[in-house]
């Protein structure tokens, strides 16, 4: 039964950098729609695990299955197409672009027109562009940011930039969303709002979430594993 198969199955994962073992014997299984927290002190290798799961680093040993499919030998963009999206500790937005255009960067993968259509603006291009804009506003509505759609991303408050980065990751329609310290730099009310947002993401998008977080109130509030 596909629904019972884990979305992420990691076995005995490890990586060495020169003579240094950064991660060793790491095992993790995440079911569909689960929210799981990865906690530990700084330097414990949590972000390295995220880099292994997205094939930024190739593991020295062990295996990773995404929805039953191995990631070994895949490029990062191929792992993304398998259904894995992530955010980063340090916000990585196109700060000169508008909020909605940042989301459209994520949506671009699913757009169904070729280069010729986009260059000469064939009807197919406009149809896809309209769909893309509608989809972006759906995300903005969920995050209560529709009124900021045409605001320059770099001028947003810190908490809103964090939410935008999550929206851009969701735009790729992932099965598994990796959040690297999503509450970093947020005040308590922003963190409480983020907690509700992550829960809503899981429920509305039908996806699993794995997060690295130091804020234990957030971890204890939403994580099931």
Predicted feature descriptions by range:
Residues 1-225:
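Glycine-rich phosphate-binding loops of nucleotide-dependent enzymes
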């Amino acid at each position: 039964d596909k629904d019972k198969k884990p979305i992420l199955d990691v076995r005995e994962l490890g990586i060495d950098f020169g003579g240094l073992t950064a991660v060793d014997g790491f095992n993790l299984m995440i079911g569909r729609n689960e929210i799981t927290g990865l906690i530990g002190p700084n330097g414990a290798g949590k972000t390295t695990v995220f880099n292994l799961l997205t094939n930024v680093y190739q593991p020295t040993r062990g295996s990773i299955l995404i929805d039953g499919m191995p990631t070994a030998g895949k490029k990062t963009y191929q792992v993304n197409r398998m259904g894995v999206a992530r955010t980063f500790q340090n916000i990585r937005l196109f700060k000169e672009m508008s909020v909605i255009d940042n989301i459209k960067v994520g949506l671009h993968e699913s757009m169904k027109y070729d280069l010729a259509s986009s260059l000469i603006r064939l009807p197919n291009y406009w149809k896809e562009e309209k769909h893309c804009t509608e989809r972006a506003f759906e995300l903005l509505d969920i995050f209560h940011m529709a009124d900021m759609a045409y605001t320059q991303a770099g001028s947003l408050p810190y908490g809103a930039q964090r939410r935008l980065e999550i929206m851009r990751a969701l735009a790729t329609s992932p099965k598994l969303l990796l959040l690297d310290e999503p509450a970093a730099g947020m005040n308590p009310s922003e963190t409480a709002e983020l907690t509700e947002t992550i829960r809503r993401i899981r429920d509305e998008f039908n996806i699993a979430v794995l997060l690295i977080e130091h804020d234990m109130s957030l971890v204890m509030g939403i994580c099931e594993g």
